[in-house]
């Protein structure tokens, strides 16, 4: 077995198709294998195109493997540019989004990346719809668990607000050599996201995709039965429960109930004026339902010799597993891209992205909270409603609190305008200028609603809160980034030289204002102006600037001997001025 130059290929895999029989080639490229006369051999070797060869009764075969030029020429996105995968000297992983996305019903880029790249750990912060995830590269390497720097088209951005269908590829820079070009902010690695662009000389096309999926818990905690729970009270030496029930009496009632529950059709017994709960309940199942999720995406694109364009719109609608629609997430994405080759040496590009999201989750400041109560309350805790002094009141189960409480609402808007200008003075040199404006706003509202309920443990009427409270928080961030850099690439015989150098400037301003007030006049219309309690206000503001110079030099001899150096010098307003 040889290559196109007649050199023997050592260690190529040779397997009989459809069988487990196989071998590898030796130092001279030879192999010996017993096969049927009509066998087909599958031959594979890294960097070469796989082949299937028919034996056809022959005793000797001469096989020539061709180099897989597609693999050898594949490029990977790195800091401020691309490099041939074969010429990489640092630890870089790269994936094409279309290859890992497929038809998976995912709502965010973070979901897609779970398990998709070696060394990248994606961890969920919660199970609520639309919850953000955290990234970690090569494990935790500091006590603060620093996060990697995430860049979208060379600029910082929250990838959770991107539609996965708008992403072309993702590269992860894992080591210091690869991420040094981004300075100290890249100490925990870098995630580079490249979005989809229009393609020249392509016909107008429309693409539409959707996904529908259902969700439910795969495994829930199992609680002790009422009999086991009360027996545990007795084993601990408890004579009377905290609300007065006699433990021995309770045990006898439970044994009788387990033998013949029809004697207590209401699921409880009243002895000496004290209520004994007997029926086993499941608070977790009571507060859950089957979740439903749908995603839609439509895109149009095309181009001629000088202009290319792409536009897309996407929608995510996710209802969680908790009862009612107070456990939900909706997101709308719009993206527009255009590129024009005004002249052979100048190319402007414009990319505008907008995302709007709205999420709701059950909110209560009551003790335990929704999930805490579902786990902590015993399995004899009653469900539904209870009559107390002639008044029908909801019991303080998680199900009822979800229904009666107001949800915590989170509204986000994210506008990103990205402009790029590429100038090519001559063949081997490109000068690139990029400007990005990113405006992010968020409004968070919470309302502690006051309502009466029956406590399922002490059977008394209580209030959810002493005073209703309405709170609204507004955040706004304006981010500006400017990059200008030049790439020079030259090939001289077997020598390949690449030089890149540039300047980066970023500014970020953040403002937050929060206000709250208690004692709503109308619980159904919470508002700061429709309340009688005291105001409580607070605000925050932050501003910083970063400027940096960066470079990268690559050298390759005959594609076999590689040398790369890169670095960055930064100045930041976060540090005090030194002289």
Which residues are covered by each model-predicted region?
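Short, small/polar-rich motifs associated with maturation and membrane association
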Residues: 1-335, 347-349, 416
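Short glycine/threonine-rich loop-to-helix capping motif typified by GTGT followed
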Residues: 577-579
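Transmembrane beta-barrel domains of outer membrane proteins
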Residues: 69, 194-196, 209, 299-303, ...
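Surface-exposed loop/interface segments of Gram-negative outer-membrane beta-barrel transport/assembly proteins
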Residues: 201-280, 316, 320-416, 432-547, ...
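Conserved short loop/turn motifs at secondary-structure junctions
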Residues: 96-100, 352-356, 568-574
């Amino acid at each position: 077995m040889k290559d196109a130059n007649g050199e023997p290929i050592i260690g190529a895999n040779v397997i009989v198709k459809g069988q487990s029989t196989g071998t590898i080639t030796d130092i001279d490229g030879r192999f010996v294998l017993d096969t049927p006369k009509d066998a087909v051999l599958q031959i594979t070797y890294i960097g070469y195109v796989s082949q299937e060869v028919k034996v056809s009764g022959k005793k000797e075969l001469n096989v020539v493997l061709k180099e897989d030029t597609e693999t050898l020429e594949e490029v990977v996105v790195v800091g401020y540019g691309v490099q041939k995968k074969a010429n990489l000297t640092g630890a870089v992983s790269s994936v094409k989004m279309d290859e890992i996305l497929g038809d998976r019903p995912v709502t965010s880029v973070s979901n897609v990346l779970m398990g998709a790249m070696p060394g990248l750990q994606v961890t969920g912060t919660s199970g609520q719809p639309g919850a953000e995830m955290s990234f970690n590269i090569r494990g935790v390497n500091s006590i603060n668990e620093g996060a990697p720097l995430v860049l979208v088209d060379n600029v910082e951005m929250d990838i959770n607000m991107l539609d996965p269908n708008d992403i072309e590829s993702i590269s992860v820079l894992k080591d210091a050599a690869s991420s040094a070009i981004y300075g100290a902010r890249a100490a925990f690695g870098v995630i580079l996201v490249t979005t989809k662009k229009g393609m020249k000389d392509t016909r107008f096309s429309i693409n539409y995709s959707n996904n529908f999926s259902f969700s439910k818990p795969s495994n829930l905690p199992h609680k002790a039965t009422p009999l086991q729970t009360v027996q545990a009270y007795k084993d601990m030496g408890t004579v009377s429960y905290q609300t007065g029930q006699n433990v021995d009496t309770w045990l006898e009632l439970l044994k009788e109930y387990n033998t013949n529950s029809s004697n207590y059709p209401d699921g409880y017994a009243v002895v000496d004026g004290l209520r004994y709960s007997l029926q086993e309940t499941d608070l977790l199942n009571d507060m859950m339902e089957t979740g439903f999720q749908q995603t839609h995406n439509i895109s149009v694109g095309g181009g001629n010799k000088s202009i290319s364009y792409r536009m897309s719109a996407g929608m995510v609608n996710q209802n969680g597993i908790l009862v009612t629609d107070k456990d939900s997430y909706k997101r709308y994405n719009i993206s527009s891209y255009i590129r024009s080759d005004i002249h052979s040496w100048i190319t402007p590009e414009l990319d505008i992205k907008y995302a709007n999201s709205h999420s709701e989750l059950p909110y209560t400041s009551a003790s335990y909270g929704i999930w805490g109560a579902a786990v902590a309350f015993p399995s004899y805790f009653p469900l539904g409603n209870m009559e107390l002094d002639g008044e029908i009141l909801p019991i303080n189960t998680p199900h009822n609190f979800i229904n009666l409480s107001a949800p915590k609402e989170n509204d986000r808007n994210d506008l990103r305008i990205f402009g790029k200008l590429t100038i090519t003075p001559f063949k081997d040199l490109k000068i690139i200028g990029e400007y990005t404006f990113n405006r992010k706003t968020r409004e968070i509202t919470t309302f502690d609603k006051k309502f009466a309920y029956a406590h399922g443990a002490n059977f008394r009427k209580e209030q959810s809160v002493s005073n209703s409270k309405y709170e609204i928080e507004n955040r706004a961030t304006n981010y500006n980034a400017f990059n200008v850099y030049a790439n020079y690439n030259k090939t001289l015989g077997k020598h390949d030289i690449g030089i890149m150098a540039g300047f980066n400037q970023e500014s970020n301003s953040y403002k937050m204002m929060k206000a709250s007030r208690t004692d709503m006049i109308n619980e159904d219309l919470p508002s700061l102006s429709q309340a009688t309690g005291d105001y409580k206000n607070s605000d925050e503001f932050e501003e910083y600037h970063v400027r940096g110079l960066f470079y990268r030099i690559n050298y390759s001899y005959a594609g076999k001997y590689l040398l790369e150096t890169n670095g960055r010098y930064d100045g930041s307003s976060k540090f005090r001025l030194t002289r």
